[in-house]
């Protein structure tokens, strides 16, 4: 473990757009999928960090599946573990959220924009929240 790594429990790999959140016992790994959505790659026993966890994305052609791209019959939101699935994106499982927009549409599409890793936990003004005394 390199100096200061015990404090840094979130690692981001820019090239693969992968986040690795971990503690002594567990790892939670998510990535930015090729369509900009967040995909959940792994949650379980602690894994050693590596720059590329893309082998955890299950991509294969399946019959009777809706595909995002005509040229890629292996990428389907219906079969990928998404971090926050929404209604109307070719994933027919229950969405995490379904919004009724002013124009009557219920289709939403949230895409990854950016990230910021900060030390500690910001205070939530006027709201109850957990806190840490060590700044970790």
Which residue ranges define each predicted feature?
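N-terminal accessory beta-strand-rich subdomains and adjacent acidic, glycine-rich linkers
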Residues: 3-136
């Amino acid at each position: 473990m390199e100096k200061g790594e015990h404090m840094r429990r979130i690692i981001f790999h820019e090239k693969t757009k992968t986040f690795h959140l971990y503690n002594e016992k567990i790892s939670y790994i998510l990535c930015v999928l090729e369509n900009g959505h967040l995909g959940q790659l792994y949650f379980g026993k602690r894994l050693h960090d590596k720059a590329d966890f893309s082998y955890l994305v299950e991509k294969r052609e399946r019959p009777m599946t809706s595909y995002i791209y005509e040229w890629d019959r292996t990428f389907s939101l219906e079969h990928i573990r998404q971090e926050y699935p929404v209604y109307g994106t070719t994933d027919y499982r229950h969405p995490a959220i379904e919004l009724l927009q002013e124009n009557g549409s219920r289709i939403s599409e949230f895409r990854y924009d950016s990230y910021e890793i900060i030390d500690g936990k910001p205070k939530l003004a006027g709201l109850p929240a957990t806190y840490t005394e060590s700044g970790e």
